[in-house]
Amino acid sequence: MMDNHEVVTAIQQKTALEIEEKLGVDLDKHWENYEIQLSEDNRVIEEIHPDMRLSLGELLSVVNRCGTEKEMENFNQIADYLEPYYEAELIQEEFYDMPIAKLTTDRQQNVKVECLSEYVSNSDIAFDFNDSIFNAVNHISHSITKSHNEIMNGDVEYQGLYPINEDMVIYCESTGKPLQQDEAAYHFEGYGYVVAEEVSPEELEGKDAYYTTIGYEDVEEKRLAPIRYIEEKKIEDGELRFNPVEEIVNDHKTEAEEVFQMESAKTVSSVMKGHGAIVVQESKTTPEVARRYVGKDTVHEEEQQQISQTREQARRHYMMKQMLGRDY
């Protein structure tokens, strides 16, 4: 079994190969102060504290691969400004080897970037490469974690990925099951977690959960929103299935179908709105009552003489049944 130093060294070697290919930065020059702290059993990466000095050439490579167009313009302005100061003393290769940026982090993982050139610091040129350097640090941290997992043959644990309480469940989008150490869960704003298996809303209501979207980065605390469900409701003898993805609003024109039974007259109307969502309205009219109810709280008055001939016929059939077939 490898000791702590051997595991860290192996992580550094494996990470350096990947980062040189992805970012064009030789990490072998920077590992001395780049802290990787493992647990006693080597299974947990307890802390990663980036600390390195980037040369002008390394900064160019990072900005070129991770930065914004504005940062590239900023870099070119700095290079053009510095070149006259060094052209008499340095050849072109040495010019790009000069230190230009110092990157450090505190114990709260706050990244600080400082300019190492007095010429630039004393000029009016902005020195802002936060986007590219933060992206580079994230690449390195992810590569360190990936290398650690491979070196330990998967026998690892990850800080921050597990809920503090067992009640704080997080579900993976791809499997629908609780998050595992090698899976990522995804949060959809407004809808919550989309899962492949049924989870009772009562089990999740009012509880906090943790989620991550990038490998094994630190997670954020979020309130778990309701999960989307396929809901079933019985309508008379059949079933109506709909997916309540969007809010259903009864503000559309409807087509009504008159449905009659011997005992009562019934009006059924439906509204279609996106994703197969359906609103069903139902009203019933009995011979003794001259008003019908639509939905939950809308009342429509009807004059008796306006009842259609078909409905009157249905009423007559009903009365005939009550009077044992005698007309009235």
UniProtKB/Swiss-Prot annotation:
Keywords: Plasmid. This is Uncharacterized protein pXO2-80/BXB0110/GBAA_pXO2_0110.
